[in-house]
């Protein structure tokens, strides 16, 4: 996915989260392990969100690999330590297609 398409998908995902009661805390947080597209907060739970975009749901979901999720988890750990946060959190994915947006909460390896 090109950076421009990625930005559009991340903007749509951010708007989706805001419309569903989340507060956007940070975007594009980088560590040596990888990047977190969106860090959001709702009901005392922090959400580290990977955004995937494709023409259809299946293509986007296939891009959430074990390697990508492992990098997301390691980067989330860095964020928590850097900010001295001792909070409830989960790792999510948001799938963006031209027609729909899906929020997959608490994804695991």
From Swiss-Prot:
Disulfide cross-links: none
A Pfam family the protein falls into: UPF0102
GO molecular function, one term: nucleic acid binding
PANTHER family (UniProt xref): UPF0102 PROTEIN YRAN
NCBIfam families: PRK12497.2-4
Family from the record: Belongs to the UPF0102 family.
Name of this chain's protein: UPF0102 protein Suden_1901
Species classification: Bacteria, Pseudomonadati, Campylobacterota, Epsilonproteobacteria, Campylobacterales
